[in-house]
Curated annotation (Swiss-Prot):
Its cofactor is K(+). Keywords: Isomerase, Metal-binding, NAD, NADP, Nucleotide-binding, Potassium. Catalyzes the epimerization of the S- and R-forms of NAD(P)HX, a damaged form of NAD(P)H that is a result of enzymatic or heat-dependent hydration. This is a prerequisite for the S-specific NAD(P)H-hydrate dehydratase to allow the repair of both epimers of NAD(P)HX. It holds the Pfam family YjeF_N. It catalyses: (6R)-NADHX = (6S)-NADHX; (6R)-NADPHX = (6S)-NADPHX. (6S)-NADPHX binds at N57, N58, G59, G60, D61, G133, T134, G135, I136, R137, G138, Q139, D167. This is NAD(P)H-hydrate epimerase. Disulfide bonds: none annotated. SUPFAM superfamilies: YjeF N-terminal domain-like. It comes from Rubinisphaera brasiliensis (strain ATCC 49424 / DSM 5305 / JCM 21570 / IAM 15109 / NBRC 103401 / IFAM 1448). One of its GO terms (molecular function) is NAD(P)HX epimerase activity. NCBIfam families: yjeF_nterm. Binds 1 potassium ion per subunit.
Length: 229
């Protein structure tokens, strides 16, 4: 079995799990987010947990993480760098849960909202990067380039803070291991199913920090078939 997955293989894993193994996408997202939340709890952040959610399923993972950490009694704040009306599928379903729970969240967040949230963070807080997923290639566009730069600057100035990346540090090409202009420098990366190719190539190790492979319920037979090809 291969030790790593490429971008295309990662996409294929999800597609086969849903279409051939009849695993609903919302179940995979729930497993991913719940297990990330459990890992975050094990890291025992003493301050606030600030979750940065982007568009698409990476943001949806962030919503699941926010819900489970909030339910566990942790101090959670959510910044959503997207218009919630643009969410669809599993991400939309989980955003509806967030709004029904009235969890502290700022939608249509801006770089100014991030600056204020970072300024208000207590020491030893944890920042969850659920901005951009494995599909990123080319150059990171506005406003995410500015957001990533601000998070990295905060990390440099606050050595007791933890930056926790969901699946892949935002802006890191998961095939080449090179930043797409800019990329989150994570202390911890929780990646789904298997390590990504870019974690062990290029500059990947400089951006991922400590890596953890998260089980999202993919049948071993699927992985055996895919990685044998």
């Amino acid at each position: 079995m291969s030790r790593v997955l490429s971008r295309d293989q990662s996409r294929e894993v999800d597609q086969i799990a849903i279409e051939q193994f009849h695993l609903p996408g919302v179940v995979l997202m729930e497993n991913a987010g719940r297990n990330c939340a459990e890992l975050i709890r094990q890291l025992s952040p003493a301050g606030q947990i600030l979750i940065l959610a982007g568009k698409g399923n990476n943001g949806g993972d962030g919503f699941v993480i926010a819900r489970h950490l909030h339910n566990a009694g942790l101090n959670v704040k959510l910044l959503v760098f997207a218009n919630p009306e643009d969410y669809s599928g599993e991400a939309e379903s989980n955003w509806r849960i967030i709004t029904a729970m009235q969890l502290p969240a700022v939608s249509n967040a801006t770089a100014a909202d991030l600056s204020q949230a970072l300024a208000e963070l207590p020491e030893s807080s944890l920042i969850v990067d659920a901005l951009l997923g494995t599909g990123i290639r080319g150059q990171v566009r506005a406003p995410f380039d500015e957001i990533i730069t601000a998070v990295n600057a905060y990390r440099d100035d606050h050595p007791h803070a933890i930056v926790f990346a969901v699946d892949v540090p935002s802006g890191l090409d998961c095939d080449t291991g090179l930043p797409c202009g800019v990329a989150i420098k994570a202390d911890q990366t929780a990646t789904f199913v298997m390590l990504k190719q870019g974690f062990v190539t290029g500059d990947g190790p400089e951006y991922t920090g400590t890596t953890h492979v998260i089980d999202i319920g993919i049948p071993p037979a699927l992985l055996d078939r895919l990685t044998a090809e």
